[in-house]
Amino acid sequence: MHGGLDRAFEGLQVRLLVPDLWQQEAIRALTDGFDVIVDAPTGAGKTYIFESLIKGRKFPAAGRQAIFTVPTRALANEKWREWKRDGWKVGIATGDLAEDLDAPVLVATLETQRERFLAGEGPHLLVIDEYQMIGDRQRGLNYELAVALAPPDTRLLLLSGSVGNPGKVAAWMERLGRRVRVIGTAERPVPLDEMPVEGLPRSAPPKYRNFWHRLSLGVMLSHYGPLLIFAPHRKAAEKIAWKVAEMLPEDDPIRLGDRRLEQGCSADILRLLKKRVAFHHSGLGFLERAAVVEPLAKAGQLRIIVATMGLAAGINFSVRSVFVAGTTYQDGPYERDVSPAELLQMFGRAGRRGLDETGYIISGRDSARLSDARPLDLRRHNELDWPTMIRRMHLAGEHGVSPFDAARELRDRLFSDQTVPLGFRPAGDGDSATT
């Protein structure tokens, strides 16, 4: 009798999710009408707050919308597919894809909502994931405007684990007339430890003695895999992937078993998968990235993944160990230093909740150390964006509002301790000072 029951329930897993106290507090604050800034490490469960609000039917109200904004198109696509699989009525808006834009839940890159914010419109709930982007030189203004122009009846949920001054952001929002709570935790779900490459086992044959051979073999012999390596640019990511693959046996190759997927993958990816290795960068095709590399990485089927640092914010899977190769990375035509906050985000991918007791940061002689990672205080980098200002003034004029008053109001709502000069004097102001 008991044996039959055992067989009947064989392979059945019951997963009971009990929210942490800080998650419960954030959910309660939002339903009580507060905006919430969540300060919690990568992997702690910040997205759970949004998912709980939707599943509990607390947001959005009938006829309104909840918008979850993310910094990359890849991440938007991933969350959209995930929530559709869960049965949600969810749309997507990115620079290259727009579907079901009026769905109760919308996943979007923040820039796609720009006109909505400028028109003074807003959803019932607006989530700004990775809100540290406010400090980004290129994209920060759009993030700043989303907060500055959100209507009073839009609840804001700001998520990050790499901001050092969330209290200052809260004070700015309070200056805008909003009720705000800062909620979070400093505790990581999986603690991190640092392991120098020199401390890993060395038993490679003489011809396999370069750094990448030692790293890949040492990590596998120590059972510290899967390993995620962050590389400075695409070519480096691919080169490193081939180097680490040289040391690994082809004893358990991944076979996709789907002709469509195999045809959608390059020969390089298919060859690397035989060693359970892959690279991950913006040059991958949609099928390669979204249907092959990312799902395999999430499922723990890859030994080593080599990703570009520029895509760090778009990575949504965890591994046991992380290694950051270099201190600079390619950002479009520019080379940028890796910031301490970016390191914090990359290192945060080490340690899988429920699988690992410890996550490992592998360090080399010239690579980033765990102590190099820390939150950074946010400050605005942008000067005024005049196309945005002129658009705001034009919309104000169409509604019978003084364009100059609209410009001043927008200026005064920016994330700045000092008044940003507009540099014009409206007609009729006589000898008054330039605004």
Language model segments and positions:
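Long, largely alpha-helical accessory region at the distal end of helicase-like NTP-driven motors
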Residues: 373-435
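Inter-Walker segment of RecA-like/P-loop motor cores
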Residues: 77-122, 181-187, 194-197
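Conserved interdomain linker/interface between the two RecA-like ATPase lobes of SF2 helicase motors
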Residues: 145-157, 162-244, 273-282, 366
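Helicase-associated low-complexity/disordered flanking segments
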Residues: 1-37, 57-58, 63-65, 190, ...
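SF2 helicase catalytic motif II
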Residues: 110-113, 117-157
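Conserved C-terminal RecA-like helicase domain
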Residues: 60, 65-70, 74-80, 84-92, ...
